[in-house]
Amino acid sequence: SETESENSIFDPDKMGSSVNSFLNKKNNVLFGSDYVYMKNFSDLDSATPEVQASQKYDGLPFYDDTAKIVFSLNKQDKSYAVTKYTQTHLSDIEQLREKTELHTEEDAIKTLYVNNKISRGSKILWRQLAYSCILKVREKNVYVPVWYVAIETPDKSIQVESVNAFSNTIVTNNTIPKVEDH
């Protein structure tokens, strides 16, 4: 849904707490307490600044178009005013397997390095563990924890690589396979 929002100002010096406080205030957004501010997936430097909050499950955010709020902002002096937001929300989330040990961010970075995804002279800007959709079965999405790693290459371009935190394998496919009953 897309909603006009009034009286919502975010302080850039305290963006995380400003956004999370706004999300947790009753009647600001539907299911606001289900979301958490995502600094690494927000962009305050563009001509059209945006802040993203992602829905979380069991403390871990989703990085997916089906579970986020994107706030469109207007810069005002030393703060940002929300002009509108778009929101998607997952309901009826089911855990499919028992909790298992995840590969660490260090494991993920080593996997990227060994597979030539981190070139010499590159710099890691940030790492984020989040759920990512890997499969759609009978209209239900299947999510796994994925390490997202932002890498600045020597030519100053930025690439975001992803590593499955269960299998420690690089996620390369952007299309999500669908399984249907026949």
Predicted regions and their residues:
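Extracytoplasmic/luminal low-complexity segments enriched in Pro/Gly and acidic/polar residues
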Residues: 78-182
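Preferential activation on post-signal-peptide N-terminal prodomains/segments
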Residues: 1-43, 48-59
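Structured segments of extracytoplasmic/periplasmic soluble domains
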Residues: 21-29, 72-74, 111, 115, ...
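Aromatic/basic-lined ligand-recognition segments
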Residues: 43-75, 122-140, 144-147
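Generic detector of bulky aromatic hydrophobic side chains
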Residues: 35-36, 74-77, 179
